[in-house]
Amino acid sequence: MRVCGFSSGSQVASFVVGHGQHPDHTLFREGWVLLRPLRSRLVDGVVEVDVEVRRRRPQDPAPAARSVHHEEPGSAETPVVHQRVGAYAIVVSPWGVLGTVNSSLTRAPGTWALPGGGLDAGEDPADGARREVFEETGQHIQLGDLVSVQSDHWIGRSVTGVLEDFHALRLIHAATCQTPSQPVLHDLGGSTERADWVPVEMWRQRRWTRPAFEALSQHLERIAGQSCWK
C-alpha cells in the first residue's frame, strides 16, 4: 500500500508502507503530522491512500509507540510474514449500525467487529468494502468517505492455524444502507459467525474489538447524524 500526503492541495510525501510500519509514524519522521484520510483507490494494481498532512512543529508529540504483541512467545515456530490491506465500513440504516460477531476461529471469539476484510489481489478498496459487507451480512450499501486508516502489528495464529507475523492495514469507510434486511452470512466457515443491526444508541452495550470500538467512538455519531434517518 502506498500513502500520499497532501498539504494545501499539493503532494508533499509519498511512500510504500513497509511491513510493520505505521503510516502516522513514517509521516512524522519525514516531518509531517497526519490530519485525516482523504480517499483510497487502486493505481496500477497498488492501493493508494491520500491523506491530509501539515508540517510538524517542535511542540508536536510523536505518535504513541506501539509494541508488537506475540501471542505465543515461547514458540520455536518461525512465523510467516503477512501484510494485509483490508476494507471495512461503518454502515448505518434506519435499523442501526451494522456489526459482525467473530467466530471461534478468531483471536477474540464472540466480540463484535465492523463488516469488512482483506482485499483480493488487484481489487479497488471501494469494491472490496462492498463485496466484504455483502459476503458477511447480505446487505447492499452506498459507500461514503474514507474516515480512518488503522495499522496494527502482531504475531499470532490465522484462522487456518498458521503462525503469522501479521500487519493489518484497515481502510474504514462511512456507508449507508437504504434497504436494510435481516443480515445473512454468505461467507461460511471463516472469521465471522453472524451479523446483526445494533441500534445506534445501544452500540456501546456490545463488546467490540479494539479497532472497531475506536472507529465507532470517533465516527459513528457524525455518520449517523448525517444520515437521512436522524
Feature map (PLM): residue ranges:
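N-terminal strand-loop-strand
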Residues: 1-14, 73-113, 141-145, 177
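Intrinsically disordered, low-complexity, charged terminal extensions of DNA damage-control enzymes
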Residues: 1-47
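The catalytic Nudix box helix
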Residues: 19-35, 114-147
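Acidic, metal-coordinating catalytic segment for phosphate/diphosphate chemistry
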Residues: 39-90
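Acidic pyrophosphate-coordinating catalytic loop
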Residues: 42-48, 78-82, 150-170
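Short, well-ordered beta-strand micro-motif
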Residues: 52, 91, 172-176, 196-199
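Phosphate/ribose-recognition catalytic cores of enzymes acting on nucleotide-derived substrates
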Residues: 166-181
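Charged phosphate-binding loop/patch that engages nucleotide di/tri-phosphates or the phosphate backbone
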Residues: 214-230
